[in-house]
Regions:
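Phosphate- and other anionic-substrate recognition elements at nucleic-acid/protein interfaces
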Residues: 1-128
Length: 128
């Protein structure tokens, strides 16, 4: 497990540097009845947050249902529905795993939310 967490950390450091990442987003932890899965997920999330934090990159967290609602139009979309929507929105991208589509959904949700917040802030300033 340690090697896997180090690998996550190192890969993210490389991506952050290569693509000059300015902002980050992760999904909030959601675990039903599996404490071991919750622990592993928490460790992977920590690796991601450390990589982003080292570079002073702000991290936003989104609830799974919010991501699904923004990306697929319904908050209880299945992994297959997310993958199908990702394929429709990005037809040139081949998603071999549903996790890849999930990651893209989080990124799209983040961009959408940033734009929404910026528009809202402009409207508030204009109204004052």
């Amino acid at each position: 497990m340690t090697a896997r967490l180090v690998s996550i950390l190192e890969q993210l450091r490389s991506i952050i540097k290569r693509f000059e990442v300015e902002t980050g987003a992760i999904e909030k932890a959601f675990v039903k009845n599996d404490p071991l899965a919750a622990l592993k997920l928490g460790q992977a999330r920590a690796s991601a947050m450390i990589a982003l934090g080292e570079s002073k990159i702000e991290v936003s967290e989104y609830a799974p249902n919010y991501v699904k609602k923004i990306f697929a139009g319904k908050g209880h979309a299945t992994k297959e529905e997310i993958k199908r929507m990702a394929s429709l929105q990005f037809p040139k991208v081949c998603f071999s795993q549903t996790d890849e589509a999930d990651a893209l959904a989080i990124a799209v949700c983040h961009v959408h939310t940033l734009k929404l917040n910026a528009n809202l802030n402009r409207a508030i300033k204009k109204a004052m």
